[in-house]
């Protein structure tokens, strides 16, 4: 196969500013044997290894909006933060939705049914997808509640719709599985890495800088160094509406939700940006 498509992809993406979907549509004739999703994965994988892609743009990372129980101003806070730091890429570290109605834990008496909750979640997500047409995301434990409940009665993943389709996410939103590595930073939801030291503990075990969500109460960055390198662990906080019934369980918790997001500059530098009072 000719490598001309690589030069064409770089030109379309960097020089003409085309979206991923537009780039892949233009390159479709170069990959007659691949379907659109496979083409996008191939092109994205190549582009993200290019020096031009890696050249300096910070990454905005958010997690845990738990739609439809997200804070009403959270997407606009993300928009302002991305603009302020000139973010060139956006990532979500899971729990896009809450799935309160289908939890194995008891639902609140006032809870909506599963379909009504899903419909509202899709409406809320459309705000995020309009503001950020292209996002790389991983799945969180709340996103996977559907699969776990199905598995509990012997229904495997082959019988289920993909989460991407269930949530009606656009082509520009790409699921990267449970975790992935980009530019020597590991991005994951953070299951089993809770508490205020969860992120740095994961970074020390993984031996590389890590970004996680999951633990709502401990947004922030910690660093660890030895004689060879420095790594960070960042918990990017959450975007939940603590007044929503889905979070009634935390009414008396000592540590309240830390609303905010992360900005990753490189594999040795990151900051946590708390959501300011103007958005609360």
PLM segments and residue spans:
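Short, amphipathic alpha-helical "recognition" segments used to contact nucleic acids or chromatin
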Residues: 2-18
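Core catalytic region of metal-dependent phosphoesterases/phosphodiesterases
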Residues: 57, 62, 67-170
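Beta-strand-turn-beta hairpins that frame and shape the catalytic cleft
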Residues: 53-60, 180-186
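Acidic carboxylate-rich catalytic motifs and surrounding loops in phosphoryl-/glycosyl-chemistry enzymes
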Residues: 137-142, 176, 273-277
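Short, basic interhelical loop/turn and adjoining N-cap
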Residues: 21, 27-45
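Short acidic low-complexity segments
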Residues: 164-182
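Short, basic alpha-helical nucleic acid-contact segments in DNA-binding proteins
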Residues: 45-53
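Conserved beta-sheet core of the metallophosphoesterase superfamily
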Residues: 184-277
